[in-house]
UniProtKB/Swiss-Prot annotation:
GO molecular function, one term: glutamate dehydrogenase (NAD+) activity
Record protein name field: NAD-specific glutamate dehydrogenase
Database matches in Pfam families: Bac_GDH_CD, GDH_ACT1, GDH_ACT2, GDH_ACT3, GDH_C, GDH_HM1, GDH_HM2, GDH_HM3
Keyword Membrane attached: no
Keywords: NAD, Oxidoreductase
Subunit structure of this chain's protein: Interacts with (unphosphorylated) GarA.
Organism in which the protein naturally occurs: Mycobacterium tuberculosis (strain ATCC 25618 / H37Rv)
Catalytic site: 845
Amino acid sequence: MTIDPGAKQDVEAWTTFTASADIPDWISKAYIDSYRGPRDDSSEATKAAEASWLPASLLTPAMLGAHYRLGRHRAAGESCVAVYRADDPAGFGPALQVVAEHGGMLMDSVTVLLHRLGIAYAAILTPVFDVHRSPTGELLRIEPKAEGTSPHLGEAWMHVALSPAVDHKGLAEVERLLPKVLADVQRVATDATALIATLSELAGEVESNAGGRFSAPDRQDVGELLRWLGDGNFLLLGYQRCRVADGMVYGEGSSGMGVLRGRTGSRPRLTDDDKLLVLAQARVGSYLRYGAYPYAIAVREYVDGSVVEHRFVGLFSVAAMNADVLEIPTISRRVREALAMAESDPSHPGQLLLDVIQTVPRPELFTLSAQRLLTMARAVVDLGSQRQALLFLRADRLQYFVSCLVYMPRDRYTTAVRMQFEDILVREFGGTRLEFTARVSESPWALMHFMVRLPEVGVAGEGAAAPPVDVSEANRIRIQGLLTEAARTWADRLIGAAAAAGSVGQADAMHYAAAFSEAYKQAVTPADAIGDIAVITELTDDSVKLVFSERDEQGVAQLTWFLGGRTASLSQLLPMLQSMGVVVLEERPFSVTRPDGLPVWIYQFKISPHPTIPLAPTVAERAATAHRFAEAVTAIWHGRVEIDRFNELVMRAGLTWQQVVLLRAYAKYLRQAGFPYSQSYIESVLNEHPATVRSLVDLFEALFVPVPSGSASNRDAQAAAAAVAADIDALVSLDTDRILRAFASLVQATLRTNYFVTRQGSARCRDVLALKLNAQLIDELPLPRPRYEIFVYSPRVEGVHLRFGPVARGGLRWSDRRDDFRTEILGLVKAQAVKNAVIVPVGAKGGFVVKRPPLPTGDPAADRDATRAEGVACYQLFISGLLDVTDNVDHATASVNPPPEVVRRDGDDAYLVVAADKGTATFSDIANDVAKSYGFWLGDAFASGGSVGYDHKAMGITARGAWEAVKRHFREIGIDTQTQDFTVVGIGDMSGDVFGNGMLLSKHIRLIAAFDHRHIFLDPNPDAAVSWAERRRMFELPRSSWSDYDRSLISEGGGVYSREQKAIPLSAQVRAVLGIDGSVDGGAAEMAPPNLIRAILRAPVDLLFNGGIGTYIKAESESDADVGDRANDPVRVNANQVRAKVIGEGGNLGVTALGRVEFDLSGGRINTDALDNSAGVDCSDHEVNIKILIDSLVSAGTVKADERTQLLESMTDEVAQLVLADNEDQNDLMGTSRANAASLLPVHAMQIKYLVAERGVNRELEALPSEKEIARRSEAGIGLTSPELATLMAHVKLGLKEEVLATELPDQDVFASRLPRYFPTALRERFTPEIRSHQLRREIVTTMLINDLVDTAGITYAFRIAEDVGVTPIDAVRTYVATDAIFGVGHIWRRIRAANLPIALSDRLTLDTRRLIDRAGRWLLNYRPQPLAVGAEINRFAAMVKALTPRMSEWLRGDDKAIVEKTAAEFASQGVPEDLAYRVSTGLYRYSLLDIIDIADIADIDAAEVADTYFALMDRLGTDGLLTAVSQLPRHDRWHSLARLAIRDDIYGALRSLCFDVLAVGEPGESSEQKIAEWEHLSASRVARARRTLDDIRASGQKDLATLSVAARQIRRMTRTSGRGISG
């Protein structure tokens, strides 16, 4: 743009811009193109990025306006400067602006000033314009800088954007100094030509020695040097001619140029008579160019008897500082002289010396003589072998500085070493500051040049002199020694320390000297590193070592943590340390590699104990604490200890980490027991009471430390228990009291532990702690409490094993309920206890959780494998923990061997068996391998179902057992599942054991729907045969799912769908078959998977078969939370919504206990899962007991080891038959119990009340009805439901088994004779003697006996007998065995079942037979000596009953005979074999054979004669009608029942007495009728009175309790004798 100088306005165009868009492009481009950022070392990309936006952001109208106003007037040779503070109204501060003549040093000088003042800048814009001004400096024209020459003056318009952080003081300094700097810049620029000319002219005069004024030996060299300097090697900043007087020089102001223009005053002289040219360095740094300290070159001249110094001030160029020494005048001559002197020394080659000289800073070379150069060069050449620092000193002649040249081996040079050198040199010379340059090249040495600036002394011009600097040889050597020591590397010191210590070899020391990182070397002294190396040497792969050092009075210590072969992050390590109760103040990680290649990580921590943890008072105690601390942290690192605040007890209570683990295990157990306090609160309580904690540990150790017999351990335990009690009694807080008392209770309740076991291979050696507990002593445990409990704890796995008796069995579950797995197991063991009622062992259950599952990798297959592997490992640890505290049995002697190193506070306990469960279905072989590793006496009988054993899935045994229940239910409603089609919905898939086998047990199944966790299967109108075949195919297909079902075989409207789908289409056929009412869902065409599953569960089908996992049906009164199966909450339904006729429970917990009751009360048919799927446990129990027998045979050599497997396999089918027989028996029992449930409700109510009071049964836990509910049902005429009856049956069996085992009954031949029948034929036939000595013979005999009793005689038999007669249940057992043998009850029962009769008929036959059992049992208890000699009674009665029974038809008369024949004919007409029909029909008459045989013995009369008389008398008196009427009396309560029994007993008793009377009056040879007639004649009055009363009763038709009581009394009045005699 052009400015009209005549314009009147003062505001030019640059000041009129109002927006960035107004700025002409050429102005913007000029500014932007000149941008310079503050970071010259930035990458080009960074600079480009900055240049793309920063300058443009600075270029504002306000900035341009201000700049223009600044440059509107500038006189020639002047510079305009403006400084803007941050709050300047201009709006773009802080900033500074300059308008000056363009010059090369302008920008550099400005940036040097800013740097020197410590002022940061963001950007510098220095556009150069062609400017035309008026003579007075007024701006006339400003244009872009033209290419080439321009008639106008080039001006630099500089704008510097300063950092916002700049302070006012800094800006003031800029404002003060910048004009002076710019003035110097202007002077240098103005005088540049004159300066060069002056130097050139002086050079010529020196060379020619004009007028003899420059005489000196080196005159020629000086002249050449001056020309060399003027040839671009020296940037001239100023010149002045000075006269010399009295050792000072005085400047001639008129001669000054550049920065020396106008300079006056005096300065010290530089030259002398011997030196024509002297080089010196200024005291003050220059602001010009790059801000270095300028050099002064003084040339002496003699003028008229006086001395003049020509002084040039300037800076050596970069080229000069790097010029070849042989090309620099003056220097080159000295160098050549030095090299010439060295030619005679072959040990120092000239080239090598020259290389050294080339490294010397060029200004220094001007001061060195040839000899000095040679000496220095030789010393440097020798430096490589000496491995030390080499120092050369030169003091400035004016004492401004000391020049220090330091050479050292290149490999010793580091920034740290250089900084140490700086400190030493500044300190030794008393310097104020220091500059340095360093040169590190390919040569073997490094060079550092330090300029130590000395303090100013005196005032210039007053002639004051600084004290001389000591640069003597002695001082040089001394300081050189200091530098050498500082230059000694850490490695040098390490090698020296290793040699002095002798514990680390030189080779290792040299290795570690190189291997340790610089960070390590800075943090660790070489002496301490020697100790670290010793630790490192001992490490192995994946090992750890902790070392304490430097503990101060406040407890702050240094902990060094060494890891071999494995690294860790600080985030991993810090929680470990913090859990110990310490505060980590500082941490430093290092790493090093051992000579053998093992990587080692070293972590240094500064730690102090938590303020609440007191320091140990003595050194010894502190050392012991440190040792325990290190061991504990080491254990934490190895995963042997968990990270929590229990670890603080190591320091607080002085415990070892093992003792802490013990307390943590007890705490974990309490949490599993439902303890109301959180773990963190428990931790706090224990940490706050270290003395009590110590006492608890002392108590535990007193109880369980293995000690020789006769020791004082018991006394120690009593004292420790007293100490614990005293500590707790002194507590004030109730919460604290409860927590610590709970710990004390657990310790006292502990029966065994593997805590002190050291045997290799034990679980304890793998950090597993097992605690066997007497649960009955632990008040904090919920009910029910098992008899034995083993809690297994480790950081990797936790688990619990609950047993309700010494011989107990149940599965081990892989639980996913880490927080409450004991609750889960307790719930399962209740069902297991009931399920085990049919087998030898009582209920047990175990479960474990995996605490450290592998982290997911994203590969599902790999994740599954990893998860399974960890589960197997934890399963093995869990079982090992159980075995650590379990007794063993010596096969040879059958003696019990306690586990080694285990103190037993209980008796022998060697029976431990396990079974598969959820998550462990395929783990049997794994469990058996663990048992074998312990030499456990059960071998592979420890876990049934292994590779050598009975494969439940292959046998289909669980499903087949469950199917017996299904068949029984359907028979009761008139459906034969094996011949008639029926509809089914199911839970499971065909790959599963129970569901897969179950859905193949009838070819008439019409499976319309099923689901598992993956799919939903729908087949609304299946073909039974076709679908059965497809299910069979899928069952045989490995790992099949419903998705493998052949879609072409599915009926119209069906399909297979993933449960992951959002919605599943609903066909009309599916809606119809599932009974989905359109009013519910509005007839939607699709349904979400959860809703469809609920519809399947509610489908109106014949059977709902559960073969899956999960709880799908609950009672309406229960919430989903009550169920405890969150995964199935979305699909669960209420039992009263289920429309299936029958539910078969092949799987566990498919229906809640209350849900079963609700389903039954709603009209459905269901048992319990424990009953339905008991075949699995029954089969496993047979397997265990068979293996125990066979293993004893193998040990004895009776059976060869290689015969064992074949023998087991050969019995598979018969074992299945034995198991299924148990299922059939139980289901028949359940059927008859259901049929009579209403009538027997009063008895059942009393029985439940007895079990609650005497056996500890919990109604709520067992889902048995309350007394209020029983009363409600009584009024409604409803009895116990089938699930309640099943539970009652189980508890009856369990109770009876326990009572029988406590007696000698199982050892008596009359009871034990049934033992062989438990085993398959192959064993019975070959090894009967060995069977009789079976390890569990008593338990097996008892189980068989009680199963037989309850299944045959009924659930209430033993209870009723005991209650009615006033005897014990054991007496009832005795009478049952006697009755069974005497009357062949078992044979009759088996024939009834084998006849395959209609359910109603078979139930009637069974109940009639039970009446015989009941009455015969009471008779034996009333008329035979007690306790009953069972064997003797059988011998007395059995043969006679068997002989007399076929003649019953001869003796029965009249109505009695007619009733029997009618009943038998009725039975026979319905398919009962005639002999069986007659045998059952005469059952109650056969009962009288006991009286008949007894009377015959007492009266010494033939039993046949007595029988004829007895039955004739019965007919004569019509007692059978009375007895029938008695049987029909109600049993509202116990008293009604007892009244019935009393009347019946009175009638039978009277009949017995009358028989005695009749036989007494009769004569031999008379018929029974004649004898009765004679008796009536002799007793006419009594008989007549009685007959009249009996006739009146019959005539009235009233047969209630009162009339029948009178009738019984009238019959009694006919008698003359008691008839109560007992024969021998």
